[in-house]
């Protein structure tokens, strides 16, 4: 049984003024009942609502457990999480969303499993309360990951996850934009478990998840998997990914564009193999170039994936212009 000295909670925030006060209240209340030191690191990812003001006020309170990190602009959830990882000091780190769909009251459940010796504690949402678009897109991504990397987990998209410090330190060594943290973490350890957690309908604000973010997520997922597969000389697996994506893109392209063109159905169908071939060629060239750039340039120069405006910690505000 492991005993952790300190817990770090990482919460990325973007325009969550409606849920932020309730989020902080419930998270602090949950953590204060634990027999462990803790910090709650909330990263504002360039919000343009009142989230910044709320965070500043909460972090500047006497004996506040809130560490507020303010990024210079909206870099995306991944970069915000990486900023939180870098400035965390706990030997156990838990990530969670700010929308309260996964309740903070589930945190002790993750700690209990981490104490059993698991390096990574994933979660899957029971009776998921999202709309059909999020459910289908999440299911699609989970299927792609399971087929390609062979790690059978039910829900790679749930943000409520726990990592021990060794895993966090290894993740920070990558320092790239196009990595998918759950996949990377799972490749760094075989000592992994996935547990069920509660999931509620979104009560505050609206979801930031849309088609554009789904495409970006698939892009990051694609390059993250491919980078690891190329290092392991598994080119066939990459080819399978390309075929899968090509077929998927062809179907989408067919429904969006071809159905609007007045052509015989036979000629419309003929376009599909052409699209697949072109997509495969282009994707293969792009991925090889991308990975070569990563290998020869990113390793030589650690490019920043985010810039911090300021940090408020221990009731003290500090301006900061670096990562």
UniProtKB/Swiss-Prot annotation:
Reaction(s) catalysed (UniProt annotation): UDP-4-deoxy-4-formamido-beta-L-arabinose + di-trans,octa-cis-undecaprenyl phosphate = 4-deoxy-4-formamido-alpha-L-arabinopyranosyl di-trans,octa-cis-undecaprenyl phosphate + UDP
Database matches in InterPro entries: ArnC_tfrase (IPR022857), Glyco_trans_2-like (IPR001173), Glycosyltransferase_2 (IPR050256), Nucleotide-diphossugar_trans (IPR029044)
Membrane topology per record: Multi-pass membrane protein
Enzyme class: transferase
Principal cellular location given in the protein's record: membrane
UniProt keyword annotations, A-Z: Antibiotic resistance, Cell membrane, Glycosyltransferase, Lipid A biosynthesis, Lipid biosynthesis, Lipid metabolism, Lipopolysaccharide biosynthesis, Membrane, Transferase, Transmembrane, Transmembrane helix
UniProt pathway: Glycolipid biosynthesis; 4-amino-4-deoxy-alpha-L-arabinose undecaprenyl phosphate biosynthesis; 4-amino-4-deoxy-alpha-L-arabinose undecaprenyl phosphate from UDP-4-deoxy-4-formamido-beta-L-arabinose and undecaprenyl phosphate: step 1/2; Bacterial outer membrane biogenesis; lipopolysaccharide biosynthesis
GO biological process, one term: lipopolysaccharide biosynthetic process
Gene Ontology CC terms: plasma membrane
GO molecular function ontology, one term from the record: phosphotransferase activity, for other substituted phosphate groups
Subcellular location: Cell membrane
Transmembrane segments annotated in the record for this chain: 238-258, 269-289
Protein EC: 2.4.2.53
UniProt similarity note: Belongs to the glycosyltransferase 2 family.
Its biological purpose: Catalyzes the transfer of 4-deoxy-4-formamido-L-arabinose from UDP to undecaprenyl phosphate. The modified arabinose is attached to lipid A and is required for resistance to polymyxin and cationic antimicrobial peptides.
Record protein name field: Undecaprenyl-phosphate 4-deoxy-4-formamido-L-arabinose transferase
Organism: Wigglesworthia glossinidia brevipalpis
Gene name of this polypeptide: arnC
